[in-house]
Amino acid sequence: MAKVSELYDVTWEEMRDKMRKWREENSRNSEQIVEVGEELINEYASKLGDDIWIIYEQVMIAALDYGRDDLALFCLQELRRQFPGSHRVKRLTGMRFEAMERYDDAIQLYDRILQEDPTNTAARKRKIAIRKAQGKNVEAIRELNEYLEQFVGDQEAWHELAELYINEHDYAKAAFCLEELMMTNPHNHLYCQQYAEVKYTQGGLENLELSRKYFAQALKLNNRNMRALFGLYMSASHIASNPKASAKTKKDNMKYASWAASQINRAYQFAGRSKKETKYSLKAVEDMLETLQITQS
């Protein structure tokens, strides 16, 4: 097999820099990382200096993802020799157990890490990832709640918990998680949109009014958010037809729905469709949105 350096006429320095760029971008192009990284390790390890260790880690994770356990094990052994007893290396061992579906061994290893260092967030998150991989959402929810008791500012964890509650159809708790996120990220249109979707799914006049409000807020933050625009149309339409709504509320929401429909129509026209095609496309969208439910992004 041709070497990467010969195939693409690149130097080892360029290959090293490419690996760094992929790390910084958190790229998951595992096949390319394995190809470039394996050549760096085999041919240029002596030239890489201290960069070799982060490259071993990077290549190992990519190798697990790519199904190259032989390469992953080689990298892990090199890291163990250099950093015996390191929690970071132990976590990599746990990730290899996960790739081999030795979930119990991985959980035990992460538990030992946490006994020695209760603040090790990486080990906690790996445990949660295992529960999710096993389809044990209830246990994953419990683990995440325990984690958030100690690390309340972890926004990624709050969003992950919201997604798990949505999967379990516990919309009230999902809404609470998203409220926490909106408090710290008031300008994030996606959080506003997802909160609106949760409220829409819960149903009832009060929730529908909140849904419409937050779909509108999502649009205010990003006027190109078509999902929020569809949501605004549907929530306003449902409020307008709700028998518990006052006459004024119905009238106002008919206006909101009409405005949203006109914006959707304009968006279709702007996309280059003819008026006839737009009419039928919009009708199809409206029919689809009659069954609007939360879907995973």
UniProtKB/Swiss-Prot annotation:
InterPro entries: EMC2-like, TPR-like_helical_dom_sf, TPR_EMC2, TPR_rpt
Effect caused by changing R28A: Loss of interaction with EMC5
TPR repeat positions: 87-120, 155-188, 192-225
N6-acetyllysine found at: K255
Membrane topology: Peripheral membrane protein
Subcellular compartments: Endoplasmic reticulum membrane
A GO CC annotation given for this chain: EMC complex
Superkingdom per UniProt: Eukaryota
A Pfam family recorded for this sequence: TPR_EMC2
Gene Ontology annotations of biological process type: protein insertion into ER membrane by stop-transfer membrane-anchor sequence; tail-anchored membrane protein insertion into ER membrane
Resulting phenotype, E180A: Decreased interaction with EMC3
N-acetylalanine: modified positions: A2
Keyword Iron: no
Post-translational modification: Ubiquitinated when soluble in the cytoplasm, leading to its degradation by the proteasome. Interaction with EMC2 prevents its ubiquitination and degradation.
Phenotype for W259A: Decreased interaction with EMC3
Protein name in the entry: ER membrane protein complex subunit 2
Organism this protein belongs to: Homo sapiens
